[in-house]
Amino acid sequence: MRLTYLLLLLVAVLFQAGSGSAEPIFFYGRQPCSYYDGVCRDKSDVNCKYIAFTYCENPNQRCCYY
């Protein structure tokens, strides 16, 4: 009984039960840096506070906030 409940809970979380979407949360992918008001900076910048799950157009840069 507990295993069934845990499996149903997992399915509800991964597939956002009730939202009408069958797309799992982890398939949404990364957002552009500007979506989070971040700034694309060189990867060697030591003052960069990296924003996870974002991307920059230039692969030599990463999304930062200051």
UniProtKB/Swiss-Prot annotation:
One cellular component (GO) term of this entry: extracellular region
Record keywords: Disulfide bond, Secreted, Signal, Toxin
Function description: Does not show antimicrobial, myotoxic, hemolytic and cell-promoting activities.
Pfam families to which the protein is assigned, alphabetical: Defensin_3 (PF08131)
Protein source organism: Ornithorhynchus anatinus
Protein name in UniProt: Ornithorhynchus venom defensin-like peptide A
Localization: Secreted
Main localization, broad class: secreted
Propeptide: 23-24
A single MF term (Gene Ontology): toxin activity
S-S pairs: 33-63, 40-56, 48-64
Tissue expression pattern: Produced by the crural gland and detected in venom from the spur located on each male hind leg. Is the only OvDLP that is expressed in venom gland alone.
Signal peptide range in chain numbering: 1-22
